[in-house]
Amino acid sequence: MDKLISNAPGYEKEIRTFWENIQMSAEQFDYARPWIQAMKSHGYRVYILSNYAYWTYLHTQETLSFLQDVDGALFSFEVHQLKPEPEIYQTLCARFDLKPEECIFLDDCQENAEGAIAVGMEAICFTTYNEAMKLLKEHNVEF
């Protein structure tokens, strides 16, 4: 935070307010845990690939209870890589013994979905739960 403030001293109050309330930036939707649990009960493995910074992760993980339901997670701060660069998708696959051609990657950013496609994954740009369910069915994912 000090580095941010030193780069923008006129915004110190705003920077401090933002970081003190960072946990409010993460929201868990009601469908998240049941959706993950349904996928897993039908034999699908579920992983998280996130561009979260360490500080953000520490201050939002309590809000994101679905983290305990996934098979694994890879956060940018752990590997110093970011979506949509190919290395982070490759690291995800290597860490969890995944084959890109067997993965369907969901992300709310089209650029990140395109990054997944570039390494051989199928991808869905997430807009709504219902749209994602429809697109998953088009990829022959049923649960």
Residue ranges of predicted features:
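Short acidic/histidine-centered micro-motifs embedded in hydrophobic/aromatic stretches
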Residues: K3, F18-I22, W55
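Asp-based, Mg2+/Mn2+-dependent phosphohydrolase catalytic module
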Residues: A53-Y54, L58-F143
